[in-house]
Regions:
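Sec-dependent N-terminal signal peptides
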Residues: 4-14
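Sec/Tat signal peptide C-region and signal peptidase I cleavage site
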Residues: 16-20
Length: 330
C-alpha cells in the first residue's frame, strides 16, 4: 500500500505539476505556437522557424529537467498554418513527454484601416509519455547495510500495466492586437486553453484526467523614441488550483551603424524566479538567452540557480512587404 501511494504521488506530480512545469518557458512569448494557437502565422513574413531549449534544476538534481521545442508556421492570406514538436524530460525515472501537433489560425482586421485585428486558432496532436519504473526506488529496496540506502538489485515486487501512454492534444486560442506601425502604443491581449478534451492520463489504471490549462497574456509595445521601445506585459496561468503569474518588461534599442536591435528583458514569476534576458534582432534573425535566478524557498538548496534558456527565430520575409503591418508588434 505504501509503495503504491508513493508511486501515485510521484505520477500525479508529473501529471499536474509537471504539466505546469511544461509551460515554464521563461521566454514564453518567444514560442508563439506554445503560448497561443491564435498566433499561428500571425507575423510579417513568408515563413517562420523557431527553436527553444531550456534546462533547469541542475543545482539540485544530477538529472536536470529539460525542455526542447521546434516549430514552423506560415501565413497563407488570412490563414496561418503550423506544426510544433516539444519534448520534456525530468527526473531519475527518465519521465519523458514527447508531443507533436499541428495548428491553424484565422486573422482578420475589424476596421477599414486594418489597424485593429483579431485572430482565432486551434491546435491538435498527440503526446506520448514514458517512464522507466526500473530506475525508481521502493521502500522494500531500502537496506541498513553500509550505512543505509536503496539497493536496486533487490526486486521491488511491483508490476505495472505499462510504461508508456499516448493522449490526444486539443487546444484553442484567441488574440486581439493593434498593428498600426506609426502608433506610439500597440496593445495586444490573448487567451488560450489547453487539454480541452481532458484526456485520461495514468499508468495505474485509475481515471486520472489531465485538467484544462488556461492562459491569459496581455501587454503593449510602447515606442519611446524612433530607436527605443519597451514592452510591459503579463502572463497568467490557471490549472485547477495551480496558478502562475509572470510580469515582465522587454526593451529594444536600434543601433543604426550595426543595423540591428539590442534586446533585453526582466521577468518576475511570482514566488518562483527572476529571469534576465539578453538578445539581438538583425534582419530576419532573433536570438535570446535567459537565465532564472530562483527566489523561492528552494533557493537555499539551489543557491539561486534556476535554469538557462536559449531561443532562436528565423523569419523568411516577402520581397514586397505590406505597407500596413498585420502582426502583433512584439
Amino acid at each position: 500500500m505504501i509503495r503504491n501511494l508513493i508511486l501515485i504521488v510521484f505520477i500525479l506530480s508529473f501529471s499536474i505539476k509537471g504539466k505546469a512545469q511544461d509551460a515554464h518557458l521563461s521566454l514564453y512569448d518567444a514560442a508563439p505556437l506554445f503560448l497561443n494557437p491564435a498566433m499561428t502565422g500571425v507575423f510579417e513574413g513568408n515563413w517562420r522557424l523557431h527553436a527553444q531549449y531550456r534546462t533547469q534544476w541542475k543545482a539540485v538534481n544530477f538529472k536536470p529537467y529539460t525542455n526542447a521545442l521546434i516549430s514552423f508556421d506560415k501565413p497563407v492570406k488570412k490563414w496561418g498554418f503550423g506544426a510544433q514538436i516539444t519534448n520534456f524530460r525530468a527526473g531519475i525515472g527518465n519521465f519523458n513527454a514527447f508531443q507533436g501537433s499541428v495548428s491553424a489560425a484565422y486573422a482578420t482586421p475589424i476596421d477599414k484601416a486594418k489597424r485593429h485585428n483579431i485572430s482565432f486558432g486551434i491546435q491538435a496532436g498527440l503526446t506520448q509519455k514514458t517512464i522507466e519504473f526500473g530506475l525508481l526506488s521502493y521502500d522494500n529496496q531500502y537496506t541498513t547495510q553500509n550505512g543505509g540506502g536503496f539497493d536496486q538489485t533487490i526486486s521491488s515486487g511491483e508490476e505495472f500495466a505499462g510504461s508508456s501512454i499516448i493522449v490526444p492534444v486539443a487546444n484553442a486560442g484567441f488574440m486581439y492586437f493593434y498593428a498600426r506601425q506609426q502608433s506610439r502604443f500597440n496593445p495586444f491581449i490573448g487567451f488560450s486553453a489547453f487539454n480541452l478534451v481532458t484526456p485520461k492520463e495514468t499508468y495505474l489504471g485509475a481515471d486520472n484526467r489531465l485538467p484544462i490549462r488556461y492562459y491569459a497574456h496581455v501587454g503593449s509595445r510602447i515606442n519611446i523614441t524612433e530607436v527605443f521601445y519597451i514592452i510591459p506585459k503579463a502572463l497568467v496561468m490557471q490549472q485547477l488550483e495551480f496558478s502562475e503569474q509572470a510580469y515582465a518588461i522587454d526593451m529594444g534599442y536600434f543601433l543604426k551603424r550595426a543595423d540591428l536591435y539590442l534586446l533585453g528583458g526582466v521577468v518576475y514569476r511570482n514566488s518562483d524566479a527572476v529571469i534576465v534576458s539578453l538578445g539581438l534582432k538583425m534582419d530576419e534573425f532573433i536570438a535570446k538567452v535567459g537565465y532564472d535566478v530562483n527566489v523561492s524557498s528552494l533557493s537555499t538548496v539551489s543557491t539561486g540557480r534556476g535554469g538557462l534558456e536559449l531561443s532562436f527565430t528565423y523569419m523568411g520575409h516577402k520581397k514586397k512587404p505590406r505597407t500596413e503591418k498585420i502582426c502583433p508588434r512584439l
